UniProtKB/Swiss-Prot annotation:
Protein name per the record: Disease resistance protein Roq1
Job description of the protein: Disease resistance (R) protein that specifically recognizes the Xanthomonas and Pseudomonas effector proteins XopQ and HopQ1, and triggers cell death. An NAD(+) hydrolase (NADase): in response to activation, catalyzes cleavage of NAD(+) into ADP-D-ribose (ADPR) and nicotinamide; NAD(+) cleavage triggers a defense system that promotes cell death. Makes small amounts of 2' cyclic ADPR (2'cADPR).
InterPro entries the record matches: Apaf_helical (IPR042197), C-JID (IPR045344), Disease_R_plants (IPR044974), LRR_dom_sf (IPR032675), NB-ARC (IPR002182), P-loop_NTPase (IPR027417), TIR_dom (IPR000157), Toll_tir_struct_dom_sf (IPR035897)
Repeat (LRR) residue spans along the chain: 200-224, 252-275, 417-440, 599-622, 645-669, 670-693, 716-739, 741-763, 784-807, 808-831, 832-857, 878-902, 904-926, 927-949, 961-983, 987-1010, 1013-1036, 1045-1070
Underlying gene: ROQ1
Reaction catalysed by this enzyme: NAD(+) + H2O = ADP-D-ribose + nicotinamide + H(+); NAD(+) = 2'cADPR + nicotinamide + H(+)
Amino acid sequence: MLTSSSHHGRSYDVFLSFRGEDTRKTFVGHLFNALIEKGIHTFMDDKELKRGKSISSELMKAIGESRFAVVVFSKNYASSTWCLEELVKILEIHEKFELIVVPVFYDVDPSTVRKQNGEYAVCFTKFEANLVDDRDKVLRWREALTKVANISGHDLRNTYNGDESKCIQQILKDIFDKFCFSISITNRDLVGIESQIKKLSSLLRMDLKGVRLVGIWGMGGVGKTTAARALFNRYYQNFESACFLEDVKEYLQHHTLLYLQKTLLSKLLKVEFVDCTDTEEMCVILKRRLCSKKVLVVLDDVNHNDQLDKLVGAEDWFGSGSRIVITTRDMKLLKNHDVHETYEIKVLEKDEAIELFNLHAFKRSSPEKEFKELLNLVVDYTGGLPLALKVLGSLLYKEDLDVWISTIDRLKDNPEGEIMATLKISFDGLRDYEKSIFLDIACFFRGYNQRDMTALFHASGFHPVLGVKTLVEKSLIFILEDKIQMHDLMQEMGRQIAVQESPMRRIYRPEDVKDACIGDMRKEAIEGLLLTEPEQFEEGELEYMYSAEALKKTRRLRILVKEYYNRGFDEPVAYLPNSLLWLEWRNYSSNSFPSNFEPSKLVYLTMKGSSIIELWNGAKRLAFLTTLDLSYCHKLIQTPDFRMITNLERLILSSCDALVEVHPSVGFLKNLILLNMDHCISLERLPAIIQSECLEVLDLNYCFNLKMFPEVERNMTHLKKLDLTSTGIRELPASIEHLSSLENLQMHSCNQLVSLPSSIWRFRNLKISECEKLGSLPEIHGNSNCTRELILKLVSIKELPTSIGNLTSLNFLEICNCKTISSLSSSIWGLTSLTTLKLLDCRKLKNLPGIPNAINHLSGHGLQLLLTLEQPTIYERLDLLRIIDMSWCSCISSLPHNIWMLKFLRILCISYCSRLEYLPENLGHLEHLEELLADGTGILRLPSSVARLNKLEVLSFRKKFAIGPKVQYSSSMLNLPDDVFGSLGSLGSVVKLNLSGNGFCNLPETMNQLFCLEYLDITFCQRLEALPELPPSIKELYVDEHLALRIMEDLVIKCKELNLIAVTKIEYQNFYRWLDSIWSDVSELLENSQKQQLDDMLQLIPFSYLSTAKREEVLKIVIHGTRIPEWFRWQDRSATTMSVNLPEYWYTENFLGFAICCSCCFYHSARSYDVEFEGSMHHYNYDSSYWKEYEEPSYDFYERDSIEITAKLTPRHKGMRTEELKKVCSFSMNVLRRATAVPNMCFAFFPFNSLCHISNLQANNPNDYGIFETCLSPGDIRHRGKQWGFNLVYKDETGGSVTHEMLINR
C-alpha cells in the first residue's frame, strides 16, 4: 500500500466510481485488480461494504477518506442517481483540495459528459420531468459532470484506441507519479488559508488561454509557501505537467542554478537530466522543450532576479494555458519580471491565530481551560504570524502552566531563535543605508509619519526614497495611513540586532540607557537615545545624565527622544549636541535652550508640555527644520523669529496659554502646511497679513481673545480647513475670498461675530452654528455656483437673504433651531439644484413660499406655525420628491388633498403630529410609497385606498415610544375601532409592520395575505387577546407575554422563517402605574422579573419541529428576567467562553440541538425620561440602587451593534479529518433596547442542522465531535448580574423535549 495514505490518516488510496452494470466485470474489475497488485488500497463498493451498513453512508465516508477518485464514465453512468450523487460528493471534496480526481471516459466522448448530450441528454430529460420540485439537485448533477469532464483524464476510445490494458497501465503510472508529486498539507497548515486561495485562484484566471505569471509575496513566516502548496494541489492535475520547486534560495546554497534548471526540466518532462554545462544554453533547451506544453510551475522563495531569468525567463518559454507562480519576500523581483498579478499574504486575524496556535499547542481547536489567559498573551506576542504560532505552539505542547509562564517571560527578552532567524534573512540582504533606516524605525520610529521620517533619513544621508521603498518591497515595513509600521516580531528582530551591534549605536532599552549615560559604554558611538524610565536612576545619576560633561561625549547623537516627566528634576540643561537631527523632549524643565545649541541640520523639534518661555534669542538658521511642536507649553510668551527657518512645514502651538502674539514672520513661511494654535486662550493678535501659499490647515479653535482675522493674500489657494470655533472674531475680511480651495470652514460658537462678507458665498460648505449676534447673512451678488451646502444652527437671523436664489449650485440647506427666523425668501424658488431642505424646530417660521422643483428630501420636523403645503399647484412639479418628514409638527391637522400627485414619493413620516386624525382618501395614489410612518398620531382609520400601495414595505402606527426620552402616551388608543386596519390584507408588499401600543381587540383575518411581512410589532396591545393566522414569512415578532404564551407552539410550527421572538412583560393597563413605581420600588419589579416565566415559555417550544432538515436557522427569544432556568446544566457568571467535553455517545437519533441562555442588563445612556399623559408631563429619574447594581459605568452597551452567541463543535481527537462546526447568532441592540430597560434574558436554540447539514451526517459521525464550546461576545462584557449557561436538548418518547441532564436521570 502506498504509505502516503496512511500518513494522512486516510483509509483508502483510491476510490472507484462507476456504473456497475456497464463496467464492473470488465474494465473496472481489471483496474481494481491491477491497483491491488501494486499495493494501492482501493475502495470498490461490492468489495468493501460491510454487512448491516448503510450503503450511502459508507460510500460517502469512503470518498472522504480516499486520496484519489477514479471516475469511470460509461453510457449508463448518468442514468444512476446513485452515481450522480457520488460524483457531487467527489467534486465537493476535490474543491477543498483534499481529493485528486482522475476521469476515465470508457465508452463515451468527453464532450458528451461535459455538455450532457447524446445518451446523457435522455437521462436528464427524465430527471427534469420527474424532479420538478428538486431542480437544484439536477443542476448540481449537471455542474458536477461538466466540471469533472474538464479535468484532464483518460479517453479510452480516442487516446488508447480501445486498448484497456494500456489505459490501465497509464492510470497506474499517473497515480504513482501524483503520489510522489503532490505536496502534503496538514489541516493545521490550512487555518485561515481558504480565503487566500480563493483570491489567488481568481488571479490565476484558468479560463484564459495565454501564459500567466502570479507572484505571492510577504514577510518571512507569513505562509507564502503554504498558500502556494494549496494552490498547486488544487490545480496541478489540470496541466500536462507540473513542478513545485520548494525553497529555491536554500536549494541554491548547495547546488548550482544549472542543476536547478535541469531539475525543473526533468520533473516537467519525466526524463533524465540533460547533458548541458551552461546556464544560457539550458535556457534555450527549456524554451525549446516546454514551449508547446501546458505546465504549472511554482518557484518558492526566490530572492534574486537571475533565478527568475534562468528558470522561467519569458512567457514564450511555455505552452498556452501555462501558469507560473512565484513566492518571494521581495516584491521588487516580481515587478522586475513583469508578473501579471501580485498578491500579498497578510498575518492571520486574531480568531484564526488562536485556532492555529491551539492546533499545535493542544492538537485541537479549543484550549484547556487553565491555559486560556496565557494563550492570549502568546498569540498577541506572535502578532498573527503563522510561523511564530506554529513554533511556539509546538514548543508549549504538553507543557504545564509553570513552563508556559516561564516561556512567556523569556520571550520578552530573548525571542525564539528559529523565528528570528527566519525573519533576519530579509535584513541580511539589505545595503548598509537600508539597514540603518530599518534599525532606526525598529528602535525609535515605528508608527511615525512617513514625511517626517523621509526628512530625518535625508538629513542622515540614508537615501530615504529608495531605502523605504526597498524595505516595503521586502516586507520589512509597511505604510498605513501615511505612517511607517512593522510587525511586532519584525521590530523585535530589529531591536535584537541593534543590541548585538558593537559598539551599540541605538539605545532604547531602559537597562542600557543607564550604562550609556553614566556607565562605561562608549558614548561617542551613540547615534540614537530613547529615555523612558527615570526610576532606574539613583540619587544624583539623573543630574549627571543631563550634565554638559555627559552630553558632550555623545558627539554623533542624531536622535534624542525623552518621553517621561521630569519628576523632581528641575536643573537647567547646560548642553545639547549640535549633531542632533531629531529632538523630542517632553516636559523640558529649562526656560530656554542652551545658548551654544546650534543644531544646523535639526529636522524635527517637539517640546510638548515644557517650561520653555522662549526657545532662543534672535533668529537661528535652521534650514532643515520641518516640524516645530510647542504645544502645552503653558509658559511660552514668545515664538521664535522664523525668517531663517524657511522649510518649516508644521507649527503647532496648541494650548500655549500665555502666548499673546506670534512673530510676524510666521505669515511669510512659504512652505508652511499646518498652523495649529487651538486653545491659545490669551492670543490677541496674528500677523496683519498671511501669505503662506502652501498652508492647508489653520486652526484657531478656542482662541477667545482673538478679535481680528488677518488679511489673506491672493496666493493662499491651498487652504482647505479653517477652524474659527469659539473665537472672539467680530468679522471676516473680504479678502477671505482668496481661499479658493477651502472645504471646511468651522464657525461654531463665534459669539462676537456680527457680520460676514459677501465673499463667504465662494466656499463650498458653510456651517454656522451658535453665533448669537449674527443677525443676518450677506446678500449674494449675481449667480454663485460655489456653495453646495449651507447649515445654520442656533443663529439669530430673522430671514434668509432675498438673493438666496442666486446660489445656483446649492443642493443641501438645513436651518435648525433658529428661533427668530419667521420667513424664507421667495427667491428660494431659484435654488434649482436644491435636493434637500430641512427646516427643524424653527418655531416662528410661518410659511414656506415655495419648493424648488429639484427637491428630493423635505423635512419640517417640529414646526409649530407652518401653514402646511396647501398650494394646489406645487405638487405637479415635484417629480423628484422622494422623502417628506413632517414629524412633531403639532400644527398639522390634515394632509393636503393634492398630496396624491407626488407619485414618486417613497417615504412619508408624519409621526407625533398629535392633531392629525385622518389620512386623505386618495393616499393610495402614492404608488411608489415604501414607508408610511404615523406613530403617535390621532389617526383612527386607514383609508381604503391604501390597498393600492403595492410597494409599501414599512407601515408603522405605534401609539407610544419605547421607554426613552419624551415618552408619549395617548388615551385615544384605548378606543380604536377593531377595523382600523381592515385594509391590511391587501398590502402584500409590506415587510415591516409596527402596531405597538394600539387598543384594538382584533387584527384582520387577512393578515395571512401579507406574504412579504418579516417584522411585526404588536407589543403593548393589552386588549389584543388572540392573533389571526400570520404569514409564514414572519422572521421577527415583538409581542406581549400574555399573547406569546398562547401562540408560541403554533407560531413556531407555521412560521417557518421565524428566528426571533421578543417578549415584553408590561401589561398595557398598568403601563402608566408601572412607570410611577419602577424608580421608587425597583426591588418589587426585580422580584417579579425572576419568576422564571422563561421556563414556562420554553416548555411550549416544539424543539422537535425546529430540528427538522428544513429548519437550519437559530431560534432566538428575548424576555425579561435575571436568572436562567436551573435545567441549563453548564452555567457560569464570569467567563465569556465555556467549553465542555461531551459524553462519548452524546449524539443519538433523538438529539435535537443546543440551548443557550444568557441574562444581561442593557440600559439607556439617558438618566431620566419625560412622559406625557393626557396633557400633563411627568419626569422620572432612575438613579436607584437597582440600577447601580446592574449598571457597569465603564461600558455602554449601546455603543455595540449586537451581542453574539457562538456554538462550536470540535473533533474529539487530534488527527481527525472532520472540520469544526460553528454557528453564530446575534441579538442586535435595537432588539434588546425594546425590553424596557429591565434585565433581559437572551435564549438561543441551535438545531443540530444549523451546525451540520443533515447530508453531512452521511460522511461524518457526529460522535467524532467531542468538545462543545460556546462564547458570548463582545468579550469585554463585565457587568454585574450576568449569568449564562447551556444544555443539550433531546426528544423524549412522547415527542416532547428533554435536556441531557433529565435524560441521564432517566
